[in-house]
Amino acid sequence: MSNTNPKLGRLAKLGLLAALSIVLVFFIHFPIFPTAKFLEYDPADIPIMIATFAFGPWYGLMATIVVAVVQGLTVRASGGIYGIIMHIIATGTFVLVAGFLYQKHKTKKGALIALLCGVVAWGLIMMPANLIITPIFTGMPVEAIRAILLPIILPFNLIKAGINA
């Protein structure tokens, strides 16, 4: 008979996946669009999504917040609080939508549908998030953000989420 607490084991595994996420972003990050270098791809959401499907959407959100804060204060410190907020909004939406859908349909087809819906939700939520938050932290006028919203910001978010799904 084992004396280990299942919740403690789950948290330990969650911690390992969060650490992997931070290591991945340390080694792999690059801009997808040369005209918007502040929009960088990184694979950090892959371990977070694994945690979400393995342990549930609330654990995925917990991992998202921890990873976003640690990355924002260390590996990606140049983004500061702006990067932390945007990461939590994007990945948080992704894990909650995909995680809750997958909880209802734990099949391969259910996982694919959940991931697709998560990708779409990510893309949709980041449009108003960029319009509201980006001007505050970057000083870019709303008109400049609006001009790149459909040709750059939406495709970037769909590409990043799609690859990480």
Each model region followed by its residue ranges:
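Loop-helix junctions at membrane interfaces
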Residues: M1-A165
